[in-house]
UniProtKB/Swiss-Prot annotation:
Residues 522-695 form the tr-type G domain. Residues 56-69, 111-132, 154-164, 259-273 have a biased composition (Low complexity). Residues 671-673 are annotated as: G5. InterPro entries: EF-G-like_DII (IPR053905), IF2_II (IPR044145), IF2_N (IPR006847), P-loop_NTPase (IPR027417), Small_GTP-bd (IPR005225), T_Tr_GTP-bd_dom (IPR000795), TF_IF2_bacterial-like (IPR000178), TIF_IF2 (IPR015760). Residues 581-584 are annotated as: G3. This is Translation initiation factor IF-2. It comes from the Bacteria. It is found in: Cytoplasm. Belongs to the TRAFAC class translation factor GTPase superfamily. Classic translation factor GTPase family. IF-2 subfamily. Residues 635-638 are annotated as: G4.
């Protein structure tokens, strides 16, 4: 007060009020504030005190009304609309209109919806009248409230709050006050009384939203006039004072407004009062209405009448609540009434009566039926007892009784049906009990919980429970790795053995059937060149074909299977040989396996200067699995460092003994570049062919294998097919794997179109519906209908297998949960892979599986042959994937779309580089780790005391010392101190670093216990890129 400023909480403390009461008054007076710690000026404090004392603040209110005259006029209109009848009683009170408008401004701003309903019901004068009474009441109440300051402010403050929330709250109060003095003065007619009640009711209904506890204070201290204003508020809150009359008035408005509307002819006001009333009863509930009648006795006659009106609507509310439990009773009475109706109906119609009697008999029979178990009888008796006890209260809903009675017979009949089902169930159980739990199961790879349960003859829930106790939350469709399966199987006493995977080179289908025996003819051999990368396979085939295919291969390595036809002259006859050139890179294992499976003779190419390498051993295993004869071509014999004998020696270790050493393997030293011994190699191939007696039936429908497939931008799906039996012609309907197609054109290895392809003939086929998988077998069908059926069934099988593979990718192992808990969420690298041919896609996917994926998992969202399209870009943008292209191109618009979406598109033509970049990207997702990098070693040779500390005179023995680097001080074998090198000087000058062989002074802020001979190790922490852990 001395400084001219007072904080709101200080004023409330001085007046012994709550902060919220003072804030409500500030809202009413439009005094700006942020919180209860805001300050008020002296003028504002005077205004607040006047309001709390019960007097209308004349100066501030007048100023507000003058400043905001347009707004006040608007509110006057709204208020007048509210009350039509009361205004007639108090038409001449326009003097104080300005003041109420100022206080009502906030109210009108907040609830715009409440204001409109008041307008229609009121006239121009009533608007002013309601506003006037609000202030006169306060002035009249001043003397009463002045003595007890604390309660009075509460009463006034709370009304202020109510206007802030809903606009109607402020207007109703003045209306009640204005009308109260008028009826007391002279009006004795019953109509005016009704008008008073209706007016009071709108006040309370509008004030219903106002704070409840604040109004309780008003009734206690103020006279009868005040309690009426505060009554609506008290009704909302829990009122302890003995003035329930106020709440009663609040409840009464619903019934009275209706009467007032009918009597006065103003339906609008009544309709608006009704919507406001339902809001109040919902909040306080029924109990509040009960409490109000008790204090109603001391109230005046008018109040008693109001209370009586209020209580009439209340009882229906109480009855509605208990009706819910009374529902069960209704069916009881309804059942009895139904029996009476049925008896009457039986007398009139004999047929109907007989039918109903039968039904009743059935019900009785069911009750007495021996099939009912003791538990069912008890349950039925309990249900009847409950129905009896609950049936007494009400009888309105008769139809519900029928379903209740009908349920009883159904329960009785169920046992009979269940008996038949029980028999069926028993039979099923007997059948299911036949399979015995195996003692040993064999596994090839991971499998789902459902598959494991079927294999072990164990309920799926038991397996899931077992996994749960191991800390693995698995579902029925989740895939388990072999280690987890072994542990689960051990719990059930079942041994697990892993099957050796069958080689992909094994020939699973016999192309020549018994029916072809009569039409067999000799066919050209299919020769596959296999061996390690860069050992000269393609160069050797070029030498045989006298072409230069290797020069066109990216990186000089073969990345597809190439099929070539070569005409060779032997003993004066022309012989045809089909060569398949397989990739030697480790990623192309599947291609080499396919090449071995379709081949008749395998040529193992080994470099004389390199010897046996990993892919050489793999090629040997493929040839043995395919059970095909093997010819070894020792290439690069023209080099100085060539050692053919050493190569022969290495091959003997793997069961390939040369003929000259007494074995059965043909070995020919050749030089692909110089063309040495090429004729000898071809002669050996033809000799082996004669021994093998290769035959086929060219007169039947073609069968064979898909060597390679890709999607051509112009020609669509293109597949390289090797016909192994029969003849393939243009127009034939064929199924390759799950792909249906009709041969539209065939092109040989030289680019010439052909009309028919005989056995051992490799051609490119156009006209397939989709790109088949490399390695799939194809067969020609006579009609398209049967071919389509086969293709559809295979497509369904492939879809199911893909789903299982997708589930397997979310592999669950015993270490998964703990690893994810330690590392956080498992990081993933999303890829979209597009390659030129299907074989390349397989090779890349196989190589990606070999990458360590403990910390970062590779998710291939799409892997398909063909060019990179805008659809691929959209998928990558939505999933945050990187598009990897291998020997492919971008479709028109794909590059622009990728630039706009910010998608990373990488194109490769060498698989080495592709795999290296993907591994680098996986490592880039890992958080870098801090690694200690040693800088040097420093020896302390002297100690100088400076003030309270000491400086070490040192000599840099090795490396260097850098200011602010990390150091360790060692004394003998003990670590004395670890910290940071704070000060580094040379010749009394600060330096950043001192190199080896120089002296320097070192000072530390937190260490000074130097001794001569101490060794200081200098190092720094650097971030190092983490590598993938195997």
């Amino acid at each position: 007060m001395n400084n001219g400023k007072v904080r709101i909480y200080e004023l409330s403390k001085e007046l012994n009020l709550d902060n919220k009461d003072v804030l409500a008054v500030c809202d009413r007076l439009e005094i700006p504030y942020k919180s209860y710690s805001s300050t008020l000026s002296e003028e504002q404090v005077v205004q607040v005190r006047q309001v709390l004392a019960g007097a209308a603040p004349s100066e501030p209110v007048a100023a507000a009304s003058a400043a905001d005259s347009p707004k006040a006029e608007r509110k006057q209109e709204i208020v007048s609309v509210r009350r039509p009848t009361p205004q007639a009683a108090g038409g001449a009170k326009p003097e104080i209109v300005g003041r109420p408008t100022a206080s009502e401004k906030p109210q009108a701003e907040r609830p715009n919806i409440v204001a409109p309903p008041r307008r229609p019901a009121a006239a121009n004068e009533p608007a002013k009248a309601p506003i006037k009474p609000a202030r006169p009441e306060k002035s009249a109440e001043k003397p009463e409230i002045v003595t007890p300051r604390p309660p009075a402010p509460a009463a006034s403050a709370e009304p202020a709050k109510s206007p802030s929330r809903p606009a109607p709250a402020a207007t109703p109060r003045p209306v009640a006050e204005t009308k109260k003095p008028k009826p007391a003065a002279a009006e004795l007619l019953r109509k005016p009384e009704i008008v008073r009640r209706s007016e009071a009711k709108p006040e309370r209904t509008s004030e219903a939203p106002t704070p409840r506890p604040k109004i309780e204070r008003r009734p206690e201290q103020t006279g009868p006039a005040r309690p009426q204003l505060g009554q609506p508020v008290a009704g909302n809150g829990v009122s302890k004072p003995a003035k329930p009359v106020k709440p009663i008035e609040l409840v009464a408005p619903p019934s009275r407004p209706k009467v007032a509307a009918s009597a006065s002819g103003v339906p609008a006001a009544a309709s608006r009062v009704l919507p406001n009333k339902p809001q109040k009863p919902t909040a306080p509930g029924g109990p509040e209405l009960k409490q109000r009648p008790k204090p109603a006795a001391p109230a005046s006659g008018e109040d008693l009448a109001a209370t009586v009106d209020v209580f009439q609507p209340v009882p229906p509310l109480e009855l509605r609540r208990p009706t819910a439990p009374a529902r069960p009773a209704r069916p009881r009475k309804g059942w009895e009434e139904e029996e009476d109706e049925r008896a009457a109906a039986n007398r009139k119609a004999g047929n109907k009566a007989a039918a109903k009697a039968k039904r009743r008999q059935l019900i009785q029979d069911d009750d007495d039926d021996d099939l009912l178990t003791a538990e069912q009888e008890l349950a039925a008796a309990d249900a009847l007892n409950l129905a009896m006890s609950l049936a007494r209260p009400s009888k309105p809903k008769v139809p519900q009784a029928k379903p209740a009675v009908a349920v009883m017979p159904t329960k009785g009949r169920k046992p009979r049906r269940e008996s038949a089902r029980e028999r069926q169930h028993r039979r099923r159980m007997e059948r299911e009990q036949k399979p015995v739990r195996p003692e040993l199961i064999s596994l090839r790879s991971s499998m789902t919980v459902q598959e494991l349960a079927q294999l072990m003859v164990v309920p799926e829930t038991d397996i899931i429970k077992s996994l749960f106790f191991k800390g693995i939350a698995a579902t029925v469709t989740q895939s388990l790795d072999v280690a987890t399966i072994e542990q689960v199987a051990e719990e059930f006493g079942i041994l697990v053995e892993q099957e050796t995977e069958e080689s992909g080179a094994r020939k699973t289908t016999q192309m020549v059937e018994d029916a072809d025996a009569e039409s067999l003819q000799t066919l050209p051999p299919v020769v596959t060149a296999m061996g390690h990368v860069d050992h000269g396979k393609t160069t050797l085939l070029d030498a045989i074909r006298k072409t230069r295919v290797a020069a066109g291969e990216a990186g000089g390595i073969t990345q597809h299977i190439g099929a070539y036809h070569v005409d060779v002259e032997h003993n004066g006859d022309q012989h045809q040989i089909v060569f398949l050139d397989t990739p030697g890179h480790e990623a192309f294992t599947a291609m080499r396996a396919r090449g071995a499976r379709v081949t008749d003779i395998a040529i193992l190419v080994v470099a004389a200067d390199d010897g046996v390498r990993p892919q050489t051993l793999e090629a040997i295993s493929h040839a043995k699995a395919a059970e095909v004869p093997l010819i070894v071509a020792i290439n690069k014999c023209d080099k100085e460092e060539a050692q053919p004998d050493r190569v022969k020696q290495e091959l003997t270790e793997y069961g390939l003994v040369p003929e000259e050493w007494g074995g059965e393997t043909v070995m020919v030293p050749v030089s692909a570049i110089k063309g040495e011994n090429i004729d000898q190699l071809l002669e050996m191939i033809l000799l082996v062919t004669e021994v093998e007696e290769l035959v086929a039936n060219p007169d039947r429908a073609a069968r064979g294998t898909v060597i390679e497939a890709h999607l051509d931008k112009a020609r669509g799906p293109v597949a390289t097919l090797l016909v192994q039996n029969g003849t393939l012609r243009v127009g034939d309907v064929l199924v390759a794997g799950s792909v249906l197609g009709k041969v539209r054109a065939m092109v040989d290895d030289r680019g010439d179109r052909v009309e028919a392809a005989t056995p051992s003939f490799a051609v490119e086929v156009l006209g397939l519906g989709d790109v088949p998988a490399a390695g799939d077998e194809f067969e020609v069908y006579s009609d398209e209908k049967s071919a389509r059926a086969v293709a559809t069934s295979r497509a369904d099988e492939q879809r199911q297998s893909r789903l299982q593979q997708a589930m397997a990718s979310r592999r669950v192992s015993l270490g998964t949960v703990s690893a994810q808990a330690q590392e956080g969420e498992l990081k993933e690298l999303n890829l979209i892979l597009k390659a030129d041919v299907q074989g390349s896609v397989e090779a890349i996917l196989g190589s990606l599986e070999q990458l360590p994926q403990k910390q970062v998992q590779v998710r291939v969202l799409l892997a398909a042959p063909g060019e990179i399209t805008e659809t691929d870009v959209d998928l990558a943008a939505a999933s945050g994937a990187v598009i990897v292209g291998f020997n492919t191109t971008l479709a028109s618009g794909a590059k622009r779309a990728a630039d706009e979406a910010g998608v990373d598109v990488r194109d490769y033509d060498i698989i080495y580089k592709l795999l290296e970049d993907i591994q680098a990207a996986m490592e880039g997702l890992l958080e870098p780790e801090l690694v200690e990098e040693p800088l040097g070693q420093v020896e302390v040779r002297a100690v100088f005391s400076i003030g309270r500390g000491a400086v070490a005179g040192c000599y840099v023995q090795s490396g260097k010392a850098i200011r602010n680097c990390n150091i360790r001080v060692r004394r003998g074998s003990n670590l004395v101190y670890t910290g940071t090198l704070d000060s580094l000087k040379r010749m009394k000058e600060d330096v950043k670093e001192v190199n080896s062989g120089y002296e320097c002074g070192i000072g530390l802020d937190s260490f000074s216990a130097w001794q001569e001979g101490d060794i200081i190790e200098t190092y720094r922490m650097v971030t190092k890129r983490r590598t993938l852990e195997v």
